[in-house]
Amino acid sequence: PMEDPKSLSGMKLWLDASDLTSAGSSWTDKSGNGNDATKNGSPTLVANAQNTHSIIRYTGNNADYHEWSDINDIRTIFWVVKANSSNQGFLLGDDSQYHFHHNQVFWHSGHSSSNVRNGSLCVNGQSINGLSTQMNSSLANLSIVSLRTTGNVEASRFSRDRNSGGRNWNGD
């Protein structure tokens, strides 16, 4: 059985598309912290997309993303995502920081946060080097991505990079 998100110590945010019946204006945070995500643009809900569970689909359009209040002490993140081959989006974005900056590989060697670059990154349980592993081909199928950072990082969006165009998630 699935854990009650509120029982997990230190949980800041839990967005679970399988709970959704529509891509409404807000996405409820299951952590109990009230970090609900506001929909911007037209991300869509795809019902029964994976083992009867719903997903949210993003087109890569500059207006399509979800945003919540800044969380600036992020240490461990889990995603279930799929990237389309044309994806230019970050795994997480922010209104002012670019800690999750990529450059075709998971992490940009100069622009991503050293706390992200030096962290422990896994895709489907396999440890990978985020500085040399191609992101889009690694995430061509729905995948579980985990990251444990070496220090605090900040994010407030999935997934839009500050106000830079062409850096929104394209995939699920």
Predicted regions and their residues:
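Extracellular/lumenal carbohydrate-interaction signature centered on repeated Trp-anchored short motifs
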Residues: 5-11, 65-77, 133-143, 167-172
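Extracellular glycan-recognition modules
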Residues: 22-27, 31-120, 153-156, 167-168
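Carbohydrate-binding surfaces in secreted/extracellular proteins
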Residues: 121-130, 135-166
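Extracellular carbohydrate-recognition regions
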Residues: 2-31
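Active-site-proximal beta-strand/loop segments in catalytic clefts of secreted hydrolases
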Residues: 16-18, 82, 95, 148-150, ...
